[in-house]
Amino acid sequence: MKRGKKYRAAAQLVDRTKLYSPLEAMRLAKQTNTMRVPATVEVAMRLGVDPRKADQMVRGTVNLPHGTGKTPRVLVFATAERAEEARAAGADYVGADELIEQVANGFLDFDAVVATPDLMGKVGRLGRILGPRGLMPNPKTGTVTNDVAKAVADIKSGKIEFRVDRQANLHLVIGKTDFTEQQLVENYAAALDEVLRLKPPTAKGRYLKKVTISTTMGPGIPVDPNRVRNLLAEETAAA
């Protein structure tokens, strides 16, 4: 794949022979933004798990202290009082049968989905549409609940969901390039802590194998996966 001049210039700023501290990586991410507007900052983690095994599926949520820089659009499947509570909490789309039909017909203009337990029998038919996009409501992530107001508020304030893919990778948005370096590191730390907490007991060998920080259209920045404490320090380790 041929890269543009801006990308090549940004890539030259990254030393591929070293592992950066989280603070240095965030600083570099801001410097390597090739877009004219603030870009999304993402962290990719390669985990030492086998996602084919049910007991090694890493999935969870984390409340980022500084949010993602984007106000997510939340869709809620609910009726009656729960529907009103969802609207009052700021949900962007609220409904039941008609809304389920809209999604089944291709409506996907939202970033998160919440559902009340009584509607999951009907929402289940959307599994093939929502599942691959990581949008299917799940009790483990707090998105199947009767407390829809709290679920909506959590998502709007920076709660993100993550799930390991078939290649044992996790991808999480941790902010934008107009965040301060400290804000990005603190969001990264919150995500890292939760991923480490969810290490499956059956996982063998090194759990956190590789960490890369990147921006939209920007180069990957290798981060020292052994740095799990004192993340605001400057030191780096040799690759």
From Swiss-Prot:
Alphabetized UniProt keyword annotations: Repressor, Ribonucleoprotein, Ribosomal protein, RNA-binding, rRNA-binding, Translation regulation, tRNA-binding
Protein's UniProt keywords contain Heme: no
GO biological process: regulation of translation; translation
UniProt cross-references to Pfam families, sorted A to Z: Ribosomal_L1
Record-level Gene Ontology MF annotations: rRNA binding; structural constituent of ribosome; tRNA binding
The keyword Oxidoreductase appears for this protein: no
GO cellular component: large ribosomal subunit
Family designation: Belongs to the universal ribosomal protein uL1 family.
Primary role: Binds directly to 23S rRNA. The L1 stalk is quite mobile in the ribosome, and is involved in E site tRNA release. Protein L1 is also a translational repressor protein, it controls the translation of the L11 operon by binding to its mRNA.
PANTHER family with a match to the protein in the record: 54S RIBOSOMAL PROTEIN L1, MITOCHONDRIAL, LARGE RIBOSOMAL SUBUNIT PROTEIN UL1M
Assembly, per entry: Part of the 50S ribosomal subunit.
Protein name per Swiss-Prot or TrEMBL: Large ribosomal subunit protein uL1
Organism: Acidothermus cellulolyticus (strain ATCC 43068 / DSM 8971 / 11B)
